[in-house]
Amino acid sequence: MNGMEHTWAPIGIDQVARRFAAIDVDWWVAGGLAIDLFLGFESRCHADIDLEMFRRDREALFDAFEGWELFTVAQGALTRWNPGETIEDPVFGIWGRPSPDAAWGVEVMLADGDGDTWRFRRDNKISLAREKLTHTTPNGIRYCTPEVQLLYKSKQARPKDDVDLAHCLHRMTTDQLLWLANAVARTSAARPWIGVLEASMKPQHE
């Protein structure tokens, strides 16, 4: 790899949408930007754009990003990925760039599931129906529902993740909060988020 391997110049979400419009697969915005799309405002600057799609649809990336170099990312190592090559289940990250000397332009994460049901990669017993997995902005950009995105964030729960949770708490439905509380309790029972989530579900008069 060259010296550009960790330099990023992410393409804009409009360009992403145009590229994926040419292929018939589900994709959605993930990461911190998904939280902002749910909130309806920019809560902070985002250095990159995280995208997600079902693992079964991964080959479509060669059509969406025709001519680009695609690499799998696992344990800090980047490996060139070519059409027809298998990506083993533990590997879920893909980086792309338009040329060997270019900065990285896109990151795509592969989601577990069968297309009808999304499953949490760290515990496949945690699931969500496909129709509840994403929401769509007025201009047609699909993004990950906040309870799933916050579940991903709960493992490390950095200060910025705590802020994301605080922003979302009073905008999420009771069903969303309950799903997240149960999922966080199952994956990391000691997380302080559990108490925050439970408190947010109490009736206001209590």
Residue ranges, per PLM feature:
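Compositionally biased terminal segments of proteins
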Residues: 1-206
